[in-house]
Amino acid sequence: MTNIRKTHPILKIVNDSFIDLPAPSSLTSWWNFGSLLGICLGIQIMTGLFLAMHYTSDSATAFNSVTHICRDVNYGWILRYAHANGASMFFICLYLHVGRGLYYGSYTYSETWNVGVLLLFAVMATAFMGYVLPWGQMSFWGATVITNLLSAIPYIGTDLVQWIWGGFSVDKATLTRFFAFHFVLPFIISAMVMVHLLFLHETGSNNPTGIPSDLDMIPFHPYYSIKDILGFLLMLTALSVLTLFSPDLLGDPDNYMPANPLNTPPHIKPEWYFLFAYAILRSIPNKLGGVLALVLSILVLAIIPLLHTSKQRSLMFRPISRFLFWLLVANLLTLTWIGGQPVEYPYIAIGQAASILYFSIILILMPLAGILENYMLKW
């Protein structure tokens, strides 16, 4: 008799996605991050759901409701900090997942890649709106500064900002709508993840060599399911240590002060995972130019499949491109550091140099390196 998992309409989908899925035999731990992101999303939805049961999205009570969760709700403190630090783990996994895709040329599966870029935008939007909800000083001023960037759009900018705010400043209406969107977006993200996996399973996974692996496939379970469980344990350990020992390590102390529209914090900055984009935004003196650079810093990922000039897929056997890739990583770390510094010399100059280098590597140097490597191999 055929196993029920191979015949049942629903179990068959699960079977073909997670059990009998043919996977390349050479996948390294860099392929763990997709499943880790799934776990992160699950943790965020679960903790977020329980937080939403006690949170009130009203500007008069939001800050106090978060304090109430931490002090009075059973294990509310662990829910709150697991949710806040879970977002950090989510972004660490996201950036490593994208980095893996860039290094091994996974972006040549353009449908999967472009759904992934949309997912990145959706997760960033969700995280931004979530940061506003505790209604502390940095929440309020972060929301004010970032939404105000839309006023740089010619002609409709000011009207658009006031439409998003629901008034003439960030206030009660803004908080309520941000909570509504923050609640619903993770479910939209879950649907997009299914589309992401659908496109991935049309082509099968890439592998470290970048060479088609149709001749050498192994079943996902037990080989990669066991490998993924090790990743889960390591990530959950890291999240637990962060949540239980230093829950405020990655947060901003200003957010423990209730939002005050009359008092601006000395340094307005977003959470650490947005600092690289914030540094690019600040490095351009013109408002519209800065906003365009901010959007393009992420949107540039969408055109990477068009910029692939090499005859090889992976960077594994391309030393010049590999050097540029690690230069890009170092550059992003530099931008992250600059984003957290005050706007003064020499940080402005370093930020501008790093921003120019960021776009130069992706748009100019990497494609040229691909052409050069083809020439060196006489291809």
UniProtKB/Swiss-Prot annotation:
Residues annotated to bind a ubiquinone: H201
Subcellular localization(s) per the UniProt record: Mitochondrion inner membrane
Transmembrane segments: 33-53, 77-98, 113-133, 178-198, 226-246, 288-308, 320-340, 347-367
UniProt keyword terms in alphabetical order: Electron transport, Heme, Iron, Membrane, Metal-binding, Mitochondrion, Mitochondrion inner membrane, Respiratory chain, Transmembrane, Transmembrane helix, Transport, Ubiquinone
Keyword flag ATP-binding: no
Residues that coordinate or bind heme b b562: H83, H182
Subcellular location, principal: mitochondrion
GO terms classed as biological process: mitochondrial electron transport, ubiquinol to cytochrome c
Amino-acid positions noted as binding heme b b566 in the UniProt annotation, renumbered to this chain: H97, H196
Residue ranges of coiled coil: none
Additional facts recorded: Heme 1 (or BL or b562) is low-potential and absorbs at about 562 nm, and heme 2 (or BH or b566) is high-potential and absorbs at about 566 nm.
Quaternary structure, from the entry: The cytochrome bc1 complex contains 11 subunits: 3 respiratory subunits (MT-CYB, CYC1 and UQCRFS1), 2 core proteins (UQCRC1 and UQCRC2) and 6 low-molecular weight proteins (UQCRH/QCR6, UQCRB/QCR7, UQCRQ/QCR8, UQCR10/QCR9, UQCR11/QCR10 and a cleavage product of UQCRFS1). This cytochrome bc1 complex then forms a dimer.
Role of this protein: Component of the ubiquinol-cytochrome c reductase complex (complex III or cytochrome b-c1 complex) that is part of the mitochondrial respiratory chain. The b-c1 complex mediates electron transfer from ubiquinol to cytochrome c. Contributes to the generation of a proton gradient across the mitochondrial membrane that is then used for ATP synthesis.
Record-given protein name: Cytochrome b
Organism this protein belongs to: Thyroptera tricolor
